[in-house]
UniProtKB/Swiss-Prot annotation:
InterPro entries: Domain_X, Maturase_MatK, Maturase_MatK_N
TM ranges: none
Species the sequence originates in: Chara globularis
Gene Ontology MF, one: RNA binding
Descriptive protein name: Maturase K
UniProt keyword NAD, yes or no: no
Swiss-Prot/TrEMBL keywords: Chloroplast, mRNA processing, Plastid, RNA-binding, tRNA processing
Coiled-coil parts of chain: none
UniProt subcellular location: Plastid, Chloroplast
GO CC annotation, single: chloroplast
Family in the record: Belongs to the intron maturase 2 family. MatK subfamily.
One GO-annotated biological process of the protein: tRNA processing
Protein function: Usually encoded in the trnK tRNA gene intron. Probably assists in splicing its own and other chloroplast group II introns.
Main location: plastid
Length: 516
């Protein structure tokens, strides 16, 4: 592993969010409380050695080490964006022990059946921690709860969401995932539905596993596709891949001149897997729905089956079944899935579909099927008619519900909708049909503005044609404040790899990876 990969691994492995007051205070209180209960007995607690390691002074020294690194603790959302190099060796025994105790204790406190003890010494500890580390008072919102003494256990929804936010922010670290596996191996009752007194906790845990799976699945695909086509130098090593901002084709094209020679460590799953990739991969994802079409050998098919199906078949407290009747109804016909047409190319009687689902059939492994590269224009026009932007024949109409917004907001809504559709279907072979969709959205925007100002379409067109027009949408790209998309830039094929960002289409996330 080169030096840059080690530095990136060190950055991703450091946990500033773990060392908020509530977490390590609870660990310290739990350990000291167990030790105090056995003071009168001859036998001493087995946690004495642990108390010596997780001592208050050691934690204080660790906080001082974090304080020296000149971070910007302006909010929780800015924690993953730090760029300062860390020199703290997180792979030592103290660090791993801290994380293990923190998670074991927090998970035990969240779903415990016993009530909180009245004589809880946490208030005094809270005050001492706040006086010892005053630099965290104005920099972390979580400290406001500590100052007012409102923190007890994680019973409120806000505190529970804070924990899962912390888990979700750090699901890309190898050491964290390894520790998380150990926690659920030791605490197997966490995966039993009867263990939870409130189903809300089970739903939150299931959502966390869902996000974990989505992140690992996308990172795995990107890592190995890029590795196969030897396009590692196109990526920026310092740029991480997350689930809300996929690798954009623009970044890849702009980084061609930079010629980066190293690839960041994207995923622990991808890092521990070795295989060769042949053929084409068609991958479409929209939130929880997945579509995977692979034209490859037996080796990669077995690999996908092992890493995808086995992970989804975890007993998370709710059934993970397969709607076989729905799949059988699609065997002899073409069907639409996530806006793309699945063509029945070579159907056989002994054809087997390997699929797993959370709630409905969402993950398909097709053999003998292919994704059509043609955009389903009629289906898209039908979806626009459902949104009341046109009729069933494709004639544009006004959107009365959007007339309450100002003119700039209306134009931004239509331009963003058009831009998302262009990004989502930019890999299609019939890209010229996007002009029909563009015509519908443009004149629907004009009619909405005319309906708002109670004027004619001709006068509205004369007034706003400088901001929204066919020529500006095709040729210009955000020039002079015009809403536009550079179609030529999107459609130029400099590589065989298409990596488009996640686009929001009718309040749904979608991602499409297409290899010619």
């Amino acid at each position: 592993m080169n030096l840059i990969s080690k530095k990136n691994e060190l950055k991703q492995g450091f946990y500033p969010l773990f060392f908020l007051e509530e977490f390590y205070i609870r660990v310290l209180i739990h350990m000291n409380h167990n030790h105090i209960l056995k003071i009168g007995n001859i036998k001493q607690s087995k946690l004495i050695h642990v108390n010596r390691i997780c001592h208050y002074l050691l934690i204080k020294r660790l906080i001082r080490q974090i304080r020296k690194q000149s971070h910007k603790y302006n909010g929780i959302s800015e924690f993953p964006n730090y760029e300062t190099e860390f020199y703290f060796q997180y792979k030592n025994r103290f660090y791993n022990l801290m994380i293990e105790n923190v998670f074991l204790l927090i998970l035990q406190m969240i779903w415990q059946h016993q009530k909180t003890r009245k004589n809880d010494p946490c208030i005094l500890i809270h005050r001492s921690i706040q006086s010892t580390f005053p630099f965290l008072e104005n920099k972390i919102i979580h400290c406001i709860w500590i100052i007012h003494g409102n923190i007890q256990l994680f019973h409120t929804i806000q505190q529970l969401n804070f924990l899962f936010l912390l888990l979700y922010e750090r699901i890309r670290d190898k050491s964290f995932l390894h520790l998380l596996k150990n926690i659920f191996n030791l605490k197997k009752e966490l995966l039993i539905e009867a263990f939870y007194c409130d189903k809300f906790h089970l739903i939150e845990l299931s959502m966390f596993f869902r996000n974990l799976y989505i992140n690992e699945f996308d990172s795995f695909i990107v890592y190995h596709i890029v590795k196969t086509w030897k396009l590692a130098y196109l990526l920026n090593p310092s740029q991480a891949i997350d689930d809300s901002s996929f690798i954009q084709k623009n970044h890849i094209l702009l980084n061609i001149k930079r010629k980066q020679k190293s690839l960041p460590l994207v995923s622990w799953l991808a890092n521990r897997s070795f295989y060769s990739l042949y053929g084409n991969i068609h991958y479409v994802r929209r939130d929880l729905s997945f579509l995977m079409a692979i034209q490859a050998g037996k080796h990669i098919s077995r690999f996908w089956k092992y890493n995808s199906i086995n992970f989804l078949q975890l007993k998370l407290g709710f059934p993970c079944s397969l709607d076989v009747l729905y799949l059988k109804s699609l065997f002899n016909q073409d069907f639409l899935f996530l806006g793309y047409r699945i063509v029945n190319k070579l159907w056989k009687k002994n054809f087997k579909i390997r699929a797993v689902s959370w709630y409905s059939p969402i993950l398909f492994f097709f053999k003998g099927r292919r994704i059509s590269t043609k955009m389903p224009v009629l289906n898209l026009i039908h979806r626009l008619s459902v949104m009341h932007l046109c009729n069933l024949e494709g004639y544009p109409i006004h959107k009365a519900a959007w007339s309450v917004f100002n003119d700039k907001q209306i134009m931004n809504i239509f331009s963003n909708l058009l831009r998302n559709i262009i990004l989502y279907y930019s890999g299609c072979s019939n890209r010229s049909d996007l002009g029909k969709i563009q015509y519908i959205l443009e004149f629907s925007c004009m009619k909405t503005l005319a309906f708002k100002h109670k004027s004619s379409i001709r006068s509205t067109w004369t007034q706003y044609k400088k901001h929204v027009s066919l020529l500006s949408l095709v040729k210009n790209r955000h020039k002079n404040g015009k809403t536009s998309v550079d179609l030529y830039f999107l459609f130029q094929k400099t590589n065989k790899l298409w990596l488009l960002d996640l686009s929001k289409i009718q309040d749904s996330l979608a991602c499409f990876i297409f290899i010619d």
